[in-house]
């Protein structure tokens, strides 16, 4: 399994299956797994489109080293004929339909899984950017730690991610009641399920 399908398996795999995260803090942590993941994504996107390997664009944190940049490019070349790298803040701004080519400053904050990117863009380029390796993964870890300390409750990474998305969204769900939120986990002392 790869991508969302594999993410759903985290913490739930039997002993003979190993779930790995090929990326950590926005960079490749397991090259072979990253290469395999990219190949699978390309195959899924390329189904029924012929045999010619595609050209791909990969977003990377703006603060990566040249070695990390080269590793991403090489992993991408495992399934593509051409790889273009784009700084994640630029990709996020384009995806958000911000005026990145206009002669004005546009600020973007992109909180990913492994890095948070803050950048000012203008005239199609990056004027100023900062990348910190603190992001969604650390928020998940903080939720797990808080529930353990404050409520003697153990929850998994997937539950922490669901909590983060539900109560920490930049675009709140108007139907969601923020005054209370039920969480299911295991009681730390008894080991029994609790809410």
Put a short name on every predicted segment:
Residues 113-115:
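Short acidic, Gly/Ser-rich segments with clustered Asp/Glu that frequently serve as metal-coordination loops
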């Amino acid at each position: 399994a790869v991508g969302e399908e594999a993410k759903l398996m985290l913490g739930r795999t039997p002993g003979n299956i190993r779930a790995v995260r090929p990326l950590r803090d926005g960079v490749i942590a397991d090259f072979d797994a990253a290469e395999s993941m990219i190949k699978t994504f390309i195959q899924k996107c390329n189904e029924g489109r012929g045999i010619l390997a595609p050209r791909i664009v990969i977003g990377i944190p703006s603060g990566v080293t040249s070695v990390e940049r080269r590793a991403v490019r090489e992993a991408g070349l495992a399934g593509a004929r051409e790889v273009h790298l784009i700084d994640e803040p630029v990709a996020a701004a384009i995806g958000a339909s911000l005026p990145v080519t206009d002669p004005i400053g546009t600020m973007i904050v992109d909180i990913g899984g492994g890095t948070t990117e803050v950048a000012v863009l203008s005239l199609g380029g990056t004027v100023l950017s900062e990348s910190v390796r603190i992001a969604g993964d650390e928020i998940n870890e903080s939720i797990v730690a808080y529930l353990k300390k404050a409520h003697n409750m153990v929850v998994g990474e997937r539950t922490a991610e669901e909590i983060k998305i539900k109560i920490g969204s930049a675009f709140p769900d108007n139907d969601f009641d923020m005054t209370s939120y039920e969480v299911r986990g295991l009681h730390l002392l008894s080991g029994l399920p609790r809410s």
